[in-house]
From Swiss-Prot:
GO molecular function, one term: serine-type endopeptidase activity
Induction of expression: Part of the tapA-sipW-tasA operon. Expression is directly repressed by the DNA-binding protein master regulator of biofilm formation SinR and activated by the extracellular matrix regulatory protein RemA. Expressed constitutively at a low level. Also positively regulated by the sporulation transcription factors sigma H and Spo0A and repressed by the transition phase regulatory protein AbrB, probably indirectly.
Entry EC number(s): 3.4.21.89
Enzyme class, spelled out: hydrolase
Coiled coil: none
GO CC annotations on file: plasma membrane
Remarks, miscellaneous: B.subtilis contains five chromosomal type I signal peptidases: SipS, SipT, SipU, SipV and SipW. They have different, but overlapping, substrate specificities and have different transcription patterns.
Family: Belongs to the peptidase S26B family.
Domain of life: Bacteria
Protein name (record): Signal peptidase I W
Gene: sipW
Example GO BP: signal peptide processing
Length: 190
């Protein structure tokens, strides 16, 4: 019982730490956790199916040199000031000192209407994805999601602590009763 109790404690405590880090990272990065140049992005549309589905969480790496990008690479770029898009490069052209990337969602019939300037490219898809985990990240970035992801594990830890303390008190009472019974029995026999 003690081993199960300790394992349960470690699992709940680890869950609280992980969820707290996800929430903090999500809040501080504007909704997308980033570590060492890698960012988790939620897939909001089906434009890249079957490569990754709506609701998936994909891992992208910050671009350090756009000249290394090739036709067929999947990139994340800023379509406008507030909209990040992840599509595949279908063509690359040079215009003066800049590269222009023609992109297309795998599930779209036609390429994107405007080419993407190298200045707007932010990251490259690493090939790693977690299906449906993007829904969780989106939930965590909302105020109610933040509250739930911090409060629920906290309540679980409090319930666990209450059960553990209650169990310890019952064990102490049982041992005290047994000791009193042994003391009475030994007093009566003398």
């Amino acid at each position: 019982m003690k081993l199960i109790s300790n394992i349960l404690y470690v699992i709940i405590f680890t869950l609280i730490i992980v969820l707290t880090l996800v929430v903090i990272s999500t809040r501080s990065s504007g909704g997308e956790p980033a570590v060492f140049g890698y960012t988790l992005k939620s897939v909001l549309s089906g434009s890249m199916e079957p490569e990754f589905n709506t609701g998936s969480l994909i891992l992208v790496k910050e671009i350090t040199d756009v000249k290394e990008l090739q036709k067929g690479d999947v990139i994340t770029f800023m379509q406008d000031a507030n909209t990040a898009v992840t599509h595949r490069i279908v063509d690359i052209t040079k215009q003066g000192d800049h590269l222009l990337f023609k992109t297309k969602g795998d599930n779209n019939a036609a390429a994107d209407s405007a080419p993407v300037s190298d200045e707007n490219v932010r990251a490259q898809y690493t090939g790693f994805q977690l299906p449906y985990a993007g829904y969780m990240l989106h939930f965590a970035s909302q105020p109610i999601g933040t509250a739930v992801l911090l409060i629920v594990p906290g309540v679980m830890l409090l319930v666990y602590a209450f059960v553990t303390i209650s169990s310890a008190i019952r064990e102490i009472e049982r041992k005290t009763k047994a000791l009193e019974t042994d003391t009475k029995d030994s007093t009566m026999s003398t």
